[in-house]
From Swiss-Prot:
Enzyme class at the top of the EC tree: hydrolase
Entries under NCBIfam families matching the protein: MTA_SAH-Nsdase, PRK05584.1
Keyword check for Hydrolase: yes
Name assigned to this protein: 5'-methylthioadenosine/S-adenosylhomocysteine nucleosidase
UniProt source species: Haemophilus influenzae (strain ATCC 51907 / DSM 11121 / KW20 / Rd)
Residues that hold substrate according to the record: 78, 152, 173-174
Phylogenetic lineage: Bacteria, Pseudomonadati, Pseudomonadota, Gammaproteobacteria, Pasteurellales
Any one biological process term the GO annotation gives: nucleoside catabolic process
UniProt-listed Enzyme Commission number(s): 3.2.2.9
Database matches in Pfam families: PNP_UDP_1 (PF01048)
GO molecular-function terms, A-Z: adenosylhomocysteine nucleosidase activity; methylthioadenosine nucleosidase activity
General function of this protein: Catalyzes the irreversible cleavage of the glycosidic bond in both 5'-methylthioadenosine (MTA) and S-adenosylhomocysteine (SAH/AdoHcy) to adenine and the corresponding thioribose, 5'-methylthioribose and S-ribosylhomocysteine, respectively. Also cleaves 5'-deoxyadenosine, a toxic by-product of radical S-adenosylmethionine (SAM) enzymes, into 5-deoxyribose and adenine.
Active site: 12, 197
Length: 229
């Protein structure tokens, strides 16, 4: 099995990249794909760049060139569900766009034409992620993760997203685009991200301060998954 891993930023993939043996590097547009072995397992690690378009470009290149059997999206997220704190883990059961709106034509909020309203994560991958996170002593919340091309940093923005998607756990900028590409290529995926901020007015300062912790927590979980896949 070859495991595909996607992170947007250099900080989000650095730990995993540095553990990779026999590493090769391929650049496609703004994306970088590192291939090699981690703990003896074949891994293709994508640093996609930030945002939905960059994530879609990179994930398409990853699936076409490296041909992984599954995809794990790692990195950081804003925690909006009650009780989440910095360093906690969110695992996707499904992902949706919070900034897509074609409701004028009868689609659900967040749904794009010719696509499902939600992209469902692979249950086996999500179950495995939850099992490993709990064994590692990490605090975990599982459910809906919403994506959009905005860094959420105000209570008003959170309130709007929660009004549209009451069950949302975390918000970020790439996961649903990655999920849409995986759906199109019929490749199982899951999102495992660590909370870096609360999406509120202090989010930008919190993100800068706690991104290294979020990267460490999410990378530890991904490493545990690699060992089991």
């Amino acid at each position: 099995m070859k495991i595909g891993i996607v992170g947007a930023m250099a900080q989000e993939v650095e730990i995993l990249k540095n553990l990779m043996a026999d590493r090769t590097e391929t650049r496609v547009a703004s994306a970088v794909i590192f291939e090699g072995k981690i703990n003896g397992k074949d891994v293709a690690l994508l640093q996609s760049g930030i945002g939905k378009v960059a994530a879609a470009i990179g994930t398409t290149a990853l699936l076409q060139l490296a041909k992984p059997d599954c995809v794990i999206n790692t990195g950081s997220a804003g925690g909006v569900a009650k009780g989440l704190k910095v360093g906690d883990i969110v695992i996707s059961d499904e992902t949706r766009y919070h900034d897509a709106d074609v409701t004028a034509f009868g689609y659900e909020k967040g749904q794009l034409p010719a696509n499902p309203a939600a992209f469902l994560s692979d249950k086996k991958l999500a179950d495995l992620a939850q099992e490993i996170a709990e064994k590692q002593g990490q605090s975990v919340k599982r459910g809906l993760i919403c994506s959009g091309d905005s860094f959420i940093n105000s209570e008003d923005k959170i309130a709007q997203i929660k009004a549209d998607f009451p069950n949302v756990t975390g918000v970020e900028m790439e996961a649903t685009a990655i999920a849409q590409v995986c759906y199109a290529f019929n490749v199982p995926f899951v999102v495992v991200r660590a909370i870096s901020d609360g999406g509120d007015g202090k989010a930008s300062m919190s993100f800068e301060e706690f991104l290294p912790l979020a990267a460490k927590q999410s990378s530890a979980l991904v490493l545990g998954m690699i060992d089991r896949l």
